[in-house]
Amino acid sequence: MKKKLIAIAVGAAMAVPAVAMADISIYGRAHVSVDFLDDGADYSETNLSSNSSRLGFKGDHQINPNLNAFFQIEQEVLFGSDNGSSFNTRDTFVGLSGNFGAAQIGRFDSPFKVARGPANLFGDQVGDMRNLTRVGDARFDERYDNTIQYTTPDFGGFNAKLAYSVHEGQSVQLDDEGDALDSDSMSMSLNYAGGPLEASLAYEQAEEDTSRGERDGIRAAAAYKLTDAFKLVGFYQTIEYDDADASDLERDLWTSDVYGVGGEYKIASNTALKAMWMTRDADADDADADMWVVGVEHKLDKAVRVYANYAVLDNDDAIRMNPWSQGRSANPSSSDDAFGEQASAFTVGLRYDF
């Protein structure tokens, strides 16, 4: 009898992991680059960068023919350094999906952030558009804590996303008078993909007690394949920064319009030339900036690609931005003497998706 119980226990222990892991997959991205960065003033150095490298687990489970459960746990991984924070939470959530669409809860990219996708030719590389769109306290390319999101089913290529971040941090905080802080955010987008066209239109708003202050923005991005080899992209964003605790100068500095155009041309089935020009028009005087970037990308196979980019960012006299600050571990701030200067960067990168 005892031997039978042991055999049953061992068999159960071996069977449970097999069942639990049946619909779970491991995925990731190793993305590194060697960069030469020059802020036009005092900083001119070669860096090795880990560019939004990640490791994740995701899975789904059919509850019944009309209802599925799904989850994802994703962490950022830093290659080339050991600074005590080599893992940082990226898109992590759990949810349900069915004919009604999908609902999920967790911490993940907002619909506004995702909406840049159609025009995102240089994501997580030198020349990333977020160097102009995600600036100062008015930034909106975020993943928010404690978020609930609903995604509609596909309707002829269209879908919509609506997300609400209930509060920042682990719980709702109180002010000095015992009142709840307004630290919630709301984001929504309308998206289309069909034939040669991919496009997104998004709106986002953050309340006054969020860590960066009250702000709202509108974003539009589109990509159109003129031929099988050539794709044209366009982008527009307007941000209004209304933080009551900020000075008039700060509100004008972070309130801005950003727009640009670009293109990708395949010179071979696995090789593409890319270029993008963007400009940031701020309300503050002498705080505008222009960025242009050119690059070539070659896919060694479906999983591995190499690339080289060159990017330049021209600053007005009251600003000191650069083309390397976003999506990368090598993101040194421009020096104090870089106001009004031209910052440039050259990068050679390797990306392996698995």
Residue ranges of predicted features:
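Outer membrane beta-barrel
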Residues: 23-35, 44-169, 182, 191-198
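Transmembrane beta-strands of outer-membrane beta-barrel pores
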Residues: 32-38, 75-79, 109-111, 164-168, ...
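Gram-negative bacterial Sec-dependent N-terminal signal peptides
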Residues: 1-23
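Outer-membrane beta-barrel architecture
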Residues: 11, 56-58, 93-95, 149-151, ...
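Detector for outer-membrane/organellar transmembrane beta-barrel domains
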Residues: 181-293, 298
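Outer-membrane beta-barrel "beta-signal"
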Residues: 265, 294, 298-300, 312, ...
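Repeated loop/turn-to-beta-strand initiation elements of outer-membrane beta-barrel proteins
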Residues: 24, 63-69, 100-104, 157-160, ...
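Residues that define the transmembrane beta-barrel architecture of outer-membrane proteins
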Residues: 43-53, 87-90, 142-146, 182-186, ...
